[in-house]
Amino acid sequence: MRQNFEQIRPMLSDKADLLQVDALEAWTESSFARLQPLLDQRAANGSIRECHGDIHLGNATLLNGDVVLFDCIEFNEPFRLIDIASDAAFLAMDLEDRDLKPLSRRFINAWLEHTGDYAALDLLNFYKAYRALVRAKVSLFRLGQEQQMGL
């Protein structure tokens, strides 16, 4: 996560934006320290698995009434070998980002009922924040590229 903050900061110049990034980084660091025992436990109990790695609405479709995911991250194993709760949190974050919070809650409730992984509840906000941070970083990279191209 630190790498994301290191990459984002140079792309920002507005003092309010930088203060917000500082606050998010402080929250992230304290949350990580608080959650470390649970993260270690999940690593030991098999919750870290090869996952999709990029579950958001742009990588999902309905096919014959079933949700089908596509375009998983195949090019980078560390992006795929993640906590299964991180994969679920990405979709929840994407739904919330699109003002679909009730659908996000329904998804998380169904996911919890299906997996029984209620211990993951303590991690969801942390993982959603991580995924939102990555999305912000990618958006800033794209904006920088567009500005360089004069778009």
Cite the ranges covered by each PLM segment:
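ATP-dependent phospho-/nucleotidyl transfer catalytic cores
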Residues: 1-56, 60-151
